[in-house]
Curated annotation (Swiss-Prot):
Gene3D superfamilies with a match to the protein in the record: P-loop containing nucleotide triphosphate hydrolases
Keyword set includes Hydrolase: yes
Function: SbcCD cleaves DNA hairpin structures. These structures can inhibit DNA replication and are intermediates in certain DNA recombination reactions. The complex acts as a 3'->5' double strand exonuclease that can open hairpins. It also has a 5' single-strand endonuclease activity.
Name the UniProt record assigns to this protein: Nuclease SbcCD subunit C
Family membership: Belongs to the SMC family. SbcC subfamily.
């Protein structure tokens, strides 16, 4: 996130609207001003716009953010435009307030917009809390994290440095992508819990199965159950054999009894058949009579149909005869109208000829009207051209007078041009001199600053060399001590190997009066001390080289400034035409500035006088061109006027000819039309030239022609229709008479045939034939009924004879005894089946339980082996290990190591190689694992101590380094949070001169990147080193914001 523009309205000491454009400030800027002017308020406004409150201990002053200088009726708000990657957003937040004319408090208002093209598009959110969530998702930092890594409030810049492990963990988890590690832990934990649950379930199932099947006595119980089951099956088999024998015997007796009962039923049915024989005989007679009447009915129906057809055709012939008589009467009436129709045809031809003459007269009248209009238009054009000619003559006279005046004014342009050029040369010479003077003054100031910096760096280099020499001497002394201690250690080891009366391996003596007895454990502290001194010496040597490189660079810059100053003196000598071997003093900047202003004023006046002469010259060209145009227009107007007058004379002659022609047509036309007495309108003589008059006459003639033509066509159409209809009716009547004769002959033939057939079938008349008819369904049903009756009677008679031959007359007396015996055997069989089913189920259950027991045992062993590694891995990842550290915490420790590595690069430069941050060694106390604490390693003392022991200035250096290291570490990760800004409120005043130089140098390095750094400080050296500033000017009516290099 990088701020682009901040707008304040009635916030803190800023009354009204104030805008800060961060894009015009460069990568690093300084906020300066008097105490209480409102410097910190700018950072508070940024935090308020994003999070709704200032950061740090100033979060409680949100009610005081509203300006006390503003009127109660005015609103107070903060608007921040910021970039996030390639996108630009704007957040607007209005403070809550209670207006003077209202009792209720106005709630806080918040909205977020995104830039689209040249406009802003508001991001739709239902509530303010939803908008704040969107802002948080964009920044990916809450207010606590923002004040620890982006905006370091006044007096609280060491928050992250001094935070405990829990607070650091919360901050780092949000800044770094540890979700994957946490997800891995959760996934391993879930799988471990699932595996443990599965194992517990299997163990419970195994205990239950062991209690149910008792695997120790399983085989004995199985053999007992199998023997009992076999015995029951043998008994069941014997019972089923006995039951089959008695059942067969009983079924034979029951079959004989059923046959006797069936014989009784058959005899009763045969008696019923004998009673139904007369009814079926009568039905057979009806069937025979219906079969004879069926062919006669078809013939009778045909005869009736022929009779009906004859009657219908006769009625149609009568109707057609009446229609033909009506058509003949209409034809006679049309023949009587033929003479009148012929007269109308001749009249139609006469009107057609008259229409041609009227159309000619109409065309002539139209031509007269058009020519009259053209003549009137030409007359108006001639009048207009005459007026234009008079106007152009007057303009020509006026332009001649104006040209005489401008000619006298343009005569002075050469003199004024010469004076203007001389002044331009003098001004260019003065500006070049002014530029050289200003550049020389800047180089003198830079050379002095660089000289002071070189002297300071020489002192630092000498100090670094002394430190390095001292560290080298300490290193040599420590090495000598280690060598001496190693010698003593060897002596102690050798002394411990000596035995009484045994020769010494060194001197060969058997007497050992004073063997070495020093403790050999003193070597390890010396070794650690030598390692620390070596590390310190390497750091000091590196720092000395860095200082020497910077000193060399500053000397080169100073030499460059001196060379540029000599070049400027040489250029000024050439400009003033002085001898380069003699010294030429560069004039004072103020004097040469006054000279430039004087020449500029004179040049402006000369330019105005030259512009007047040039303007007169330009104005002279325009009247000359206008005079030429006016004379050309005057000549063109005269020529066009002559053409228009000639055209008007020609039109007048043509108009006279057309009037003579229409007069001739008007004399001829009434004679032809009056002879026919058709055109009724009577017009005056002066209207004969009117187009409407001839148009009305033409329309009247055409109307009469259409009416006559329509009447004649209708007469011809009706006459033709009557002729055609009469011919068609005659042909139709003849055809129907032929059909009537054919039908009558067929009727007589069919009537004789039906009479002969009816006599042969013994029917007296047609009604008896109709009464004897039966439908096909009725006939089929009656025949099927008789056939079924005969077949059923024959079958029952044959079955009765067969059964009487098979059965006897005695009824067995032991049927009840057989039934009782069968019933007893059925009960025994059911008892045996129930016993077999119980034994089989018991045996199956026992076997199934034992198999489940064995399967469960195998599964438990397999699952135990499979889950062991998973459970162990889950315990290790979730902190159930020797160090009691979780996997995500281990990842955060790695990130913290990386942050401190970045931070130490800058901290060692600022502390001249003395301090570097170190992550505390992992340890476990009563409260658990403490792995995110930060310690400070002191290269001068070789000790490691808590960060809280640092002084104020040292704490500030460590906090700045840690904040920058945190930003560097985050930015190196793709997809991480982008930290493009860092805001520091005070803290530089606690640094000494050398530390301040180092801090400013590091900030200069950061300035070369794309990161923005804003600093609030009263340190004067920062104001000279940082070119871009925001100056807060304090007045008794509120503060004002000024940007740029203004002091």
């Amino acid at each position: 996130m990088k701020p682009m523009r901040l707008t304040l309205h009635n916030i803190g000491p800023f009354v009204g609207t104030h805008t800060v454009d961060f894009t015009a400030l460069g990568p690093i800027f300084l906020v300066c001003g008097k105490t209480g002017s409102g410097k910190t308020t700018l950072f508070d406004a940024i935090a308020y716009a994003l999070y709704g409150k200032p950061l740090g201990t100033r979060a409680e002053v949100i009610r005081s953010l509203r300006s006390h200088y503003a009127a109660p009726s005015e609103a107070a708000f903060a608007t921040l435009e910021f970039s996030l990657g390639t996108k630009i957003y704007r957040v607007h937040r209005t403070l809550t307030c209670t207006l003077s004319h209202r009792k209720t408090e106005q709630p806080e208002q918040l909205y977020l917009e995104q830039k689209k093209g040249h406009g802003w598009e508001r991001i739709a959110c239902a509530h303010k809390s939803e908008t704040e969530c969107v802002i948080h998702d964009l920044l990916k930092l809450n207010s606590k994290e923002f004040e620890r890594v982006v905006m370091l409030p006044q007096g609280e810049c060491a928050q992250f440095l001094k935070a405990n492990s829990k607070e650091k963990k919360e901050t780092l988890m949000n800044l770094f992508p540890v979700d994957q590690y946490t997800a891995l832990m959760e996934r391993a934990k879930k799988k471990s819990l699932h595996a443990k649950a599965v194992l517990e379930t299997l163990r419970s199932q195994l205990e239950t199965l062991c209690a149910e099947c008792m695997p120790d006595t399983y085989h004995e119980r199985k053999q007992t159950l199998e023997a009992e089951l076999q015995h029951a099956r043998d008994a069941l088999q014997q019972t089923r054999i006995s039951h089959a024998y008695y059942t067969q015997k009983r079924e034979a007796l029951e079959a004989q009894l059923k046959k006797q009962q069936l014989c009784k039923e058959l005899r009763a049915r045969i008696e019923t058949y004998r009673a139904q024989e007369p009814v079926h005989a009568e039905t057979q007679k009806r069937i025979d009579r219906a079969r004879k009447a069926a062919p006669l009915a078809a013939h009778i129906k045909h005869v009736t149909q022929c009779e009906q057809d004859a009657q219908r055709i006769h009625a149609e012939i009568q109707e057609k005869m009446r229609s033909r008589e009506q058509l003949l009467m209409k034809r006679a009436a049309h023949v009587a109208q033929q003479s009148s129709i012929e007269e109308q045809r001749r009249l139609l031809q006469t009107l057609h000829s008259a229409c041609i003459h009227i159309e000619d007269a109409h065309d002539v009248a139209t031509s007269i009207r058009d020519i009259s209009c053209q003549a009137h238009t030409l007359t108006q054009h001639i009048h207009t051209l005459a007026q234009q000619k008079t106007t152009l003559t007057q303009q020509e006279q006026s332009l001649c007078k104006e040209l005489d005046i401008l000619q006298r004014e343009a005569g002075t342009i050469d003199t004024r041009t010469s004076a203007f050029n001389d002044l331009q040369i003098q001004l260019a010479h003065a500006k070049k001199t002014q530029e050289l003077s200003q550049r020389y003054a800047e180089l003198c100031a830079a050379h002095a600053t660089c000289t002071a910096q070189c002297e300071k760096l020489e002192k630092i280099h000498a100090q670094k060399s002394a430190y390095s020499t001292r560290a080298r001497e300490q290193l040599l002394q420590t090495k000598e001590q280690i060598h001496l201690q190693e010698t003593r250690t060897h002596a102690v080891v050798l002394a411990r190997l000596l035995e009484h009366q045994e020769p010494c391996p060194v001197c060969g003596s058997c007497i050992h009066p004073n063997p070495a007895r020093q403790d050999i454990d003193n070597l390890e502290p010396l070794t650690r001390r030598m390692q620390r001194i070596e590390q310190t010496y390497a750091q000091l040597e590196t720092s000395e080289k860095d200082v020497y490189h910077i000193l060399t660079s500053e000397r080169e810059r100073r030499a460059s400034y001196s060379a540029q100053m000599q070049e400027i003196q040489h250029s000024f000598s050439i400009l003033t035409s002085c001898d380069t071997r003699s010294s030429c003093d560069i004039p004072n900047v103020q004097k040469i500035t006054v000279r430039v202003l004087d020449l500029t004023e004179k040049l402006s006046r000369a330019k105005d006088m030259l512009a007047c002469a040039q303007h007169a010259l330009l104005r002279k060209k325009q009247p000359e061109q206008d005079l030429q145009d006016v004379r050309a227009h005057l000549q063109q107007c005269s020529q066009e006027l002559a053409k228009k007058e000639t055209a008007l004379h020609a039109l007048q002659e043509t108009l006279t000819q057309q009037r003579v022609r229409i007069h001739a047509l008007s004399i001829r036309l009434p004679k032809e039309l009056l002879a026919s007495n058709l055109l009724a309108p009577q017009k005056m003589q002066h209207e004969k030239e009117s187009v409407a008059y001839w148009k009305e006459m033409l329309a009247h003639c055409q109307t009469l022609m259409r009416e006559l033509h329509t009447h004649i066509e209708e007469y011809d159409r009706e006459f033709n229709e009557i002729e055609n209809a009469s011919s068609a009716l005659g042909a139709d009547i003849a055809a129907r008479e032929d059909a009537l004769n054919h039908v009558q002959k067929e009727y007589m033939h069919l009537a004789r045939t039906v009479c002969c057939a009816r006599t042969e079938a013994h029917f007296n008349n047609n009604e008896e034939v109709t009464a004897a008819l039966m439908t096909d369904a009725e006939l089929s049903h009656a025949a099927a009924e008789i056939q079924f009756f005969n077949e059923l009677r024959a079958a029952d008679t044959h079955l009765l004879k067969t059964l009487e031959a098979e059965i006897g007359t005695e009824i067995p007396s032991d049927l009840d005894e057989l039934n009782a015996q069968c019933h007893t055997l059925v009960k025994d069989e059911e008892n045996f089946l129930s016993r077999i089913e119980i034994l089989s189920a018991t045996l199956h259950t026992l076997t199934h339980q034992y198999l489940k027991y064995e399967e469960c045992s195998k599964q438990l062993a397999q699952k135990t082996q499979e889950s062991a590694k998973l459970i162990t891995l889950s315990d290790e990842l979730n902190g159930i290990n020797q160090k009691k550290i979780q996997f995500d915490a281990w990842a955060l420790i790695s990130f913290l190591h990386e942050i401190t590595a970045y931070a130490n690069i800058r901290l060692q430069k600022m502390s001249e190689g003395r301090y570097h941050l170190r992550v505390a060694d992992s340890h476990v106390n009563a409260r658990g694992y403490q792995g995110l604490a930060l310690l400070v390693a002191d290269a001068y003392t070789g000790s490691v101590r808590p960060s809280a022991t640092l002084s104020g200035g040292e704490t500030f250096m460590a906090s700045i380094s840690l904040a920058l290291g945190l930003a560097d570490s985050i930015q190196t990760r793709s997809g991480g949070i982008v930290l493009d800004s860092l805001f520091i409120d005070e803290g530089f005043g606690s640094l000494d001169e050398a530390s301040l130089d180092k801090a400013i140098g590091i900030l200069d390095e950061i300035r070369e990147g794309s990161r923005m750094i804003g600093i609030i400080s009263h340190v004067h050296e920062l104001r000279t080193r940082i070119p871009h500033k925001i100056l807060i000017k304090k007045t008794n009516a509120g503060s004002h914001v000024m940007q740029g290099d203004a002091e």
